[in-house]
Amino acid sequence: MKKLNMEILSERWIIATFSFQGRQYNTKKTSQILPALFAVICAAFAGYFILIGSGMFTEPSVALILLATITILLLSSSKKSFYFILLPLTLLHAFYTPTGLNFGPPSYQYIASLFATDILETKEFLLQIPVSSYLIAFAIPILIFLQYKSAVKFGIKFYRNKTFIALATLLFAYNMPLAEPLKETVSSTLKIVDEVQKLKQISQSDNWGKSTLENSRYDDYVIVLGESARKDYHHAYGYPIENTPFMSNAKGTLIDGFRSAGTNTVASLRLMLTFPDKEKWEPNYSLSLVDLIKSAGIKTYWLSNHGMIGKFDTPVSSLASKSDETFFLKKGGSFNSTNFSDFDLLPKFAQVLENSVQGKRFIVLHIYGSHPMACDRIEDYPKIFDDKDLNPRYGYLNCYVSSIKKTDEFLKRVYDQLEENVKKNHRTFSMIYFSDHGLCHQQDEKTIYFCSIKTVSAESTIIFRYSKFHQMIWNAKNIRCLNQV
């Protein structure tokens, strides 16, 4: 009887033990629900921020966000995959996010700008990005770490859940675009490196052959390359603020509808200053404008307020180096953060004009114009309006329209020097001005600001003086004369 009772008690104890373990197992599963939900939410927000920060997915679909979330959770399942794969990719995306949110996905143009940017330009570029973009960038690695630490602490292993694996498999099979920003960055970087190598190889090449200049009226041909000047912010093009007194009153020809070849200096000028392949939208450095002019026996000069990292480090510096004489205000390229004024080019320009020379000359003046940040461009020039009389929202706009007026003043001074040279040395001239590209116009509740545009169809300011070069402009919409007698 005692033996039977002992067996019954033993059986009850075993059943009770199993029952207690079952309750303990269920309690453990319940305790993991909230941490798992927290990890999923963190991963989802991180995935969403990564997608919009890439610049390629401004409004990502729910499926795409789920795909990003699952990718993050899977890569977080292993310590090695987290630290050696997910974390580096996360930091790379976070680094690019401020740029991607405001200027679009990685491309040749932005990678080229990175190669050609000095410290001052980098500072000004970063300052024009809204604080909210930096907050999103900082949030990405924080969210990634939160979901990882939560999963580790509570022993959450998503890869063991069959439903999770099935959903992940279906989503991955459907679409896998997350690697596109990275692939585009690598592709653009390799393209830049390849282009630099080609620039070095063809630096001395010239496929124009011998050229002749017939029926030329002028002794000196001057081109002023502007910077970041939107057409619709010039009074000469109808803007109500009178910020172009010289352009609006000088005798010349105004081109309306000329479009920039790219969204930044390098992307634009490498096409505008060569004879490009219009089908592939690629430059032909062996057929450059400088080489064409030199082939006609004209002496060439390039005076620049832009930095020169190295003779062949960027397409623009390579094109400039083809000139017979070059002068750069910024010595040392990327390591020079001095904010030079465009007016600092004028003494060198006067020196070039005073030099005794036989034959014709071609002179390029590459100015900083209205390059962001525009307020830094006018440290030596008065603003059109007093800031205290304006709503703070229009503070940067005041700087921008004032920088255009400064460029107009620069053009007047160049013109006056050329006129003086006519009287002194009897050398006639042709003067041309155009901006390399425009800027996009954005605004929020607090301010109106400008940034690099995402498309290549950016209208730039074009003004031609005393020449018939408009015959070369195949995509101009309208040509009209200004103040002709």
From Swiss-Prot:
Enzyme class: transferase
Listed GO biological process terms: lipopolysaccharide core region biosynthetic process
GO terms for cellular component: plasma membrane
An MF annotation (GO) of this entry: phosphotransferase activity, phosphate group as acceptor
Protein name: Putative phosphoethanolamine transferase HI_1064
Segments traversing the membrane: 33-53, 55-75, 81-101, 125-145
EC number: 2.7.-.-
Provenance organism: Haemophilus influenzae (strain ATCC 51907 / DSM 11121 / KW20 / Rd)
Keyword annotations from UniProtKB, A to Z: Cell membrane, Membrane, Transferase, Transmembrane, Transmembrane helix
Membrane topology label: Multi-pass membrane protein
KW Signal (keyword) present: no
Family: Belongs to the phosphoethanolamine transferase family.
Cytoplasm in keyword set: no
Cellular localisation: Cell membrane
